[in-house]
Structure formats: C-alpha cells, structure tokens
C-alpha cells in the first residue's frame, strides 16, 4: 500500500515534475527508469557496462536523447523487494520510458508461481500508472543462469531451466495481457554454456561482453516502443 500511495501522490504533482523535466532535458528527451535486479545493474561487470546504461547511450546515439534517471536495482531482489523499495523511486523519477526485468530471485527463493504472478502484475500496473504512454514499458524476461559454472548450486533438487521457463511463461502472459512488448533473453543467455567470455569472474553472472550482446537484442524493441 505504501508504494501505491507514493505513486498516487506523485501523480498529483506530475505536471510540475513533467514541466521541470522538460525544462532540464528538452521536450523530446526520454527519461528512462529501470526496475530490476542484479542483471539490470550489471552484476559481474560495472553499472556503466550494464545493459540499461548501454541502452540509454545507444538510444541517444541513434538520435533519441535518453537520460537514465533511475536504476535502483539490487542484487538478490525479488518482486516483493521491488514493490517495497524500487517502485517509490520509480514513481518519483517521473519517467516516460521504462524497462522491467525481474523474477530470477523469486524462483531461487521458492516464491510460489501464483504469488510471483500477483506481485509482477502489481508492479506492471503501478508502473503503467506513471508512464504517460502505456506502450513504453518494455519487459525483459529471465536468463538461464543454469548454464553458468556456479548456476547448478542453486538447483536444490529442482531443474533450473524448466523452473525459469515456467516463470518466463508467467512474465509473457502478464505482458501480453497488458499489450506490452517482451524481449526474450532466455535463448541468448544459454550461450554462456559454451562461451566462457560471456560469464563474469564470479562464475554466475554475465560479463560485460554478454551485457553488450543482450543490449543489442533489447535495443530494437526499445526503439520501436519510443516511436511516435
């Protein structure tokens, strides 16, 4: 309820925030905010090498001025953590473009699929309340970390790929229900099995090279979402 109240309060003062943003960045600029976990802050590389940072620079280079105004993502965070800690900051940032990439830690922590669906749906709906253009929420699904050297340690008797695929199905269904574009990162992430340069030194997270390849996959969907 705290996050809902925060969003509603900020919605009331939204016109003022929008005016300030327009004054600072120009009316045609994109204010990009991120809701995510370790994959969105570039764990295994640096935040500057994370795919959201790369995406903001790529969009700007392509002619669409983009400012990464908020990325409070944290390693280990679940959808519950994002609702409690990231959503208020997302609302305060007053973005007009956003990406959402969450779910891996829900699965690791044995969150029930129905609970994950409910929390994910809440996140999507609250983010959409903030965005002026509802097609500008881009969803990225969960990569397959089971193919990394350290990934199997998190199985605990479960089949990781199958479990993540099940959560990705939920993500796809909730995105489709709201007419949101979805980038499927799962197949390209499986290249970490055979390409050691795609795995960070921790043996679990993607390397800077991998994040660069992910961004190349995400960029066309982001560019399409930003078209008038």
Stretch-by-stretch model annotation:
Residues 42, 78-81, 106-109:
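Short active-site-adjacent helix-start/loop capping segments
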Residues 48, 79, 164:
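Conserved donor sugar-nucleotide recognition element shared by glycan-biosynthetic enzymes
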Residues 1-4:
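Positively charged n-region of N-terminal signal peptides that target proteins for export
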Residues 74-79, 159-160:
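Short, flexible loop segments at the rims of nucleotide/cofactor-binding pockets, characterized by
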Residues 20-75, 87-94:
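Serine-esterase "nucleophile elbow" of acetyl-processing enzymes
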Residues 50, 78, 207:
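Residue-level signal for threonine
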Residues 7-16:
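Bacterial N-terminal signal peptides
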Residues 65, 84-228:
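Alpha-helical cap/lid subdomain in secreted, periplasmic
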């Amino acid at each position: 309820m705290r996050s809902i109240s925060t969003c509603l309060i900020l919605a009331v003062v939204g016109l003022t925030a929008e005016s300030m943003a327009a004054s600072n960045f120009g009316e045609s600029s994109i204010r990009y905010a991120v809701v995510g976990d370790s994959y969105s802050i570039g764990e295994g590389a640096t935040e500057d090498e994370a795919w959201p940072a790369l995406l903001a620079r790529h969009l700007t280079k392509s002619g669409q001025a983009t400012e990464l105004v908020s990325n409070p993502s944290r390693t280990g965070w679940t959808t519950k953590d994002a609702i409690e800690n990231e959503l208020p900051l997302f609302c305060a940032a007053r973005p007009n473009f956003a990406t959402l990439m969450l779910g891996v830690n829900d699965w690791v922590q044995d969150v029930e699929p129905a609970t994950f669906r409910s929390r994910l749906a809440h996140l999507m709906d609250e983010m959409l309340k903030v965005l002026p253009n509802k097609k500008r929420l881009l969803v990225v699904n969960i990569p397959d970390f089971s193919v990394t050297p350290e990934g199997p340690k998190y199985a605990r008797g479960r089949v990781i790929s199958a479990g993540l695929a099940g959560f990705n199905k939920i993500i796809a269904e909730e995105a489709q229900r709201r007419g949101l574009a979805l980038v499927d990162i799962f197949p390209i992430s499986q290249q970490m099995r055979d390409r050691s340069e795609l795995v960070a030194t921790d043996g679990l997270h993607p390397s800077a090279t991998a994040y660069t390849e992910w961004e190349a996959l995400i960029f066309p969907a982001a560019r399409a979402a930003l078209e008038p």
